[in-house]
Amino acid sequence: MKRRSDEEISAPLYEYDAAIRAQYGFFAGVDEAGCGPLCGPVVVAACILDPEKPVYGINDSKKLTEKKREALFDEIRDKALAYKIVFVGPEIIDRDNILNATMSGMKQAAEGLDIVPNLVLVDGNRVPAALEIPAQPVVKGDATSASIGAASILAKVSRDRYMMELDKQYPQYQLAKHKGYPTRLHYELIEQYGIQPFYRRSFLKKQGYWPEGK
């Protein structure tokens, strides 16, 4: 079976975007990375792609290798008309819950773009209620829209890089390996080394890893 080229992979996503652009003009894709981990931030990105400078290979970031995501990350930043990356830390996640924290990050990212879009497409089934720009949810948007796919790559790579840096400070937690997600290894390391400030208290309480009242 012939392997599809990057251009062939991205073609349907760019066709989707072209139809949206024909109706609305400038629009942004928004996506997040890191809703599920036990520690670290949730990262949200908004991106307005330049239709004259396509980035071939864009797809749902989870379907791409780390090497491919890294290469696309740099190309997206070089070619995009505008992009914004927002980090929402564990303290906000614990205070507001992960959904509200993510929605807040999406609002900040979309409204923080250097170009004000006429529409925001958000991956998933809901949009931030307080967003001052018209928005539409797109289920599986990161595999449907090139702009959302680009945002998913920006968010994923940004978060992974953050966790790699955190790993250098706390090598005993092996954050570079699991990126903070709730793996068996991660739970074993928490039991062995305890809790650090970058952990999400609300997540750990649900799993019985955080003393009540703290």
PLM region spans:
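RNase H-like, Mg2+-dependent phosphodiesterase core
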Residues: 1-214
